[in-house]
Amino acid sequence: DNPYVPEVKAMKGLTLYEVPQLSVTAAFFCQKVNPTGNPNIGSGKLDGNGIPVDFFADINVRKAFLHAFDRKTYKKDVFNDLVVMPSSPNIKGLPYHKDVPVYEFDLKKSADYMKKAWDGKVWDQGFKMIITHNTGNEMREAAAHMMAENIMSLNPKFQIEVRNVEWKDYLVKYRNFMYPIFIIGWGADYADPHNFMYTFMHSRGVYGRYMAYENPEVDRLCEAGIANVDPDKRREIYHKLQDLWYTEAIANTIYQQIVVRAYRDWVKGYVPNAMLTDANEMLMDIWKE
């Protein structure tokens, strides 16, 4: 675990491998929540006691939440700085990655966007909602609390509760559009941007569909990216998609983990693998020197 890495680094006779993973966790904004028996949206109205089902369809709300996430503090306090803070789902290590702008932590900008949201009704009426994370995941729990506390600090009429849900139930509920914000990760099935950008952005993607996010231009680009074999054309496509991730304020990519492996310095032959860090520990390929 990251808190113990400095202690391990101080030990003599060890070789450490820091391996950024081809995986990313994000907080997704659902733009059409299922209201049936749903406590996560309160009254289901913008009346101070809930949020409407399409609360996050207003880009001003999404931008407000993005500006309320303190990436630098999160990186230091949760990961001891040993993490990659991604700017889009096309994380470092994947082809055609580029750093796109992020919504830096700025509570004034967050408040300004909240004042614009829903023609000023969000700021005047206030709202109440619940953010959930899966039980036992401290990294996602910390992200949920950071969003909740910073948004609530903007206006006493903003009320957000954080709850944990068992993993098996979490999966069922986010797939039934029960969460206005759901926090979940994705690991590479194969090391290509399509596996991430389609998953996160396409209206039929594994996560895109459960955000109820639909953008014909995004769908077209996602489909063109996998259908094309020309590297230059693919680069252009995926650069556009990464730009759209920012301008559309689709969701909040929170972290790309770095796994640390420690071996005695006389152990040789370990080759880090960004997809299969643990499974790649092939004993037949490791030797003592």
Enumerate the language-model features and the residues they cover.
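Extracytoplasmic/periplasmic ligand-capture domains
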Residues: 1-78, 84, 94-250, 286-289
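Glycine-rich and polybasic anion-binding loops at the starts of cofactor/ligand-binding domains
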Residues: 254
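Long beta-strand-rich cores associated with HINT superfamily self-processing modules
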Residues: 261-289
